[in-house]
Amino acid sequence: MKNPFEAMKQLKKLQEKMAKIEEELEQTLVEGTAGGGVVKIVMTAKEEVKEVKIDPEVVNKDEVDILEDLIAAALRDALTKAKEKSAEKMGSLTDGLPLPPGLF
């Protein structure tokens, strides 16, 4: 069996990497768009919405339902991108560790 102190050192390194990745995810911005850029949502890779931008040209009180659909689509797009960034960064966390496949 491996030296328990070595395992503790690896765990500490893993925790340090995790903290660094969490910080990077908080700073990484992604942008989701819909309607050809008419609606934009900017969020962190930790899925915190920072901005919602709507082109004033498309604001029409008679077509609020279309605008609502565009906002929802932009949010879904931004969430997908945030999750992809998060998975990408988290994948690098376990590189070189003897873990079973699919654990993270």
UniProtKB/Swiss-Prot annotation:
It is found in: Cytoplasm, Nucleoid. Gene3D superfamilies: Nucleoid-associated protein YbaB-like domain. Residues 84-104 are annotated as: Disordered. GO terms for cellular component: bacterial nucleoid; cytosol. GO terms for molecular function: DNA binding. It comes from the Bacteria. Keywords: Cytoplasm, DNA-binding. InterPro entries: YbaB-like_sf, YbaB/EbfC. Coiled coil: none annotated. Its main location: cytoplasm. The keyword Cytoplasm applies. The keyword rRNA-binding does not apply. Belongs to the YbaB/EbfC family. Binds to DNA and alters its conformation. May be involved in regulation of gene expression, nucleoid organization and DNA protection. Homodimer. HAMAP family: DNA_YbaB_EbfC. PANTHER family: NUCLEOID-ASSOCIATED PROTEIN YBAB (PTHR33449:SF1). This is Nucleoid-associated protein Dtur_0258.
